[in-house]
Amino acid sequence: MIQGFSHIGIGVRDLDASIRFYSEVFGFSEFYRLDFNDNEVAATMEQEGAFRSAMLLRGDVRIELLQWVDVPTSGGGKKPMTELGFTHLSFRVDEIDDLTEAVLAHGGAVHRQTLSYVGPEGSAQTGLLYYTDPDGTRIEVMTNVPQLSELRQ
């Protein structure tokens, strides 16, 4: 039985730069960092080779960043939302404008500079905007998102 959400893993080109991005833009803290040299952990990921890993924390949210050291990687850049599988991270935020400046200053990108508002009529509108991190992982930020306890009533 599922007890809760553990973490999400994100492949990155530069572990140190990605730690800075998620720490300085979104306020994550580095919990630990590990180096794996072609061992059983890499084998569980169906890949041989060395990689570096860092676990970042912010409240109950955990992000594991993975950088392959001696293995060619692919991807990077913005993936289409129509691609199957993982499409984006989404964070509830207090405010969006200051984040945009921080994302750009730390190597990320803003998509279309459009801020949309959605929600049922007569309720507070949820603002949302999409960014990407320096490796193209799409990140949605949302304001005025109801807490789960409010939705369950």
Residues covered by each model-derived region:
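Core segments of cupin and vicinal oxygen chelate
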Residues: 11-60, 105, 122
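Vicinal oxygen chelate
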Residues: 13-16, 59-61, 67-135
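Surface-exposed loop/turn and secondary-structure junction residues enriched for glycine/proline
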Residues: 8, 54, 118-121, 145
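Residue-level detector of high-confidence beta-strand sites
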Residues: 31-33, 113, 141
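Short N-terminal helix-initiation segments at or just after the protein's N-terminus
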Residues: 1-9, 26-41, 72-81, 107-108
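N-terminal beta-strand motif that seeds the catalytic metal site of vicinal oxygen chelate
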Residues: 1-17, 34-36, 41-43, 86-91, ...
